[in-house]
Amino acid sequence: MGLATCLSLQSCSRPQAAASKSADPLQGKLVLTGSSTVAPLAAEIGKSFESKHPGVRIDVQSGGSSRGISDARQGTADIGMVSRALKPEEKDLKGFLIAKDGVTVILQKDNPVKSLSDKQIVDIYTGKVTNWKQVGGKDGTITVVNKAEGRSTLELFAHHFKLKNTDIKAQVVIGDNEQGIKTVAGNPDAIGYVSIGSAEYSAANKVPIKLLPVGGIAATTENVKNGTFPISRPLNLVTKTEPQGLAKEFIDFAQSQQVSDIVKKQNFVVSK
């Protein structure tokens, strides 16, 4: 009798457990593609969202802001990730600000150069200056690290310094911020430019790089926040149409105060 009672209780408890798992109305999968700057942030937000909604999976893939725009338009991604403002020809898309960031120049930590003027940066990237001793550093051939086409970090950098990508004479072309940081950290003669958030996070975790000021303004998250840093940008999620259902719930969550600590931990600026 006891065994029968036990079996009966077990059989009764299973539907209840199943019911509790399916009680959350949010179910399904979202695919996010695009900016390598936004991707780590979106992935962490995604993990938090998944923990609240066990029936949901968030798949985050990087590849550049151009990919985020293209995939959102074509419907190959539910949400695109774009680390810049939308262009006039992209206004058919819906944009949602989730954080702010800046772009700055980085050097290997042991490089004695502490700052570069805008003109010196332009001269280095256009091949007019090729040795560190020409800008007050040690004798050493400069390794110029540039971003690949389609990266919004490149667009922002080039726009600020009034450069065309065809003007830039680079020895190394990289994709995401992590590649750029690793390349510069491993080469005392390298110069690159990356997301301030990514660079600050790496430097705080003992990666041997340093962030140079731009226009005399220190490259810090705080200066992006107070609006004094000259190269700043919005970090956006984009959709083809007004989001609904699971996509809307995720975007609302990504814009909420619930993710403020995640944004700050990634060294970005909270948007609200």
Language model regions located:
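Sec-dependent N-terminal signal peptides
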Residues: 1-4
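C-terminal motif of bacterial Sec signal peptides marking the signal peptidase cleavage site
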Residues: 7-11
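Exported/periplasmic ABC-transporter solute-binding proteins
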Residues: 12-66, 70-76, 82-272
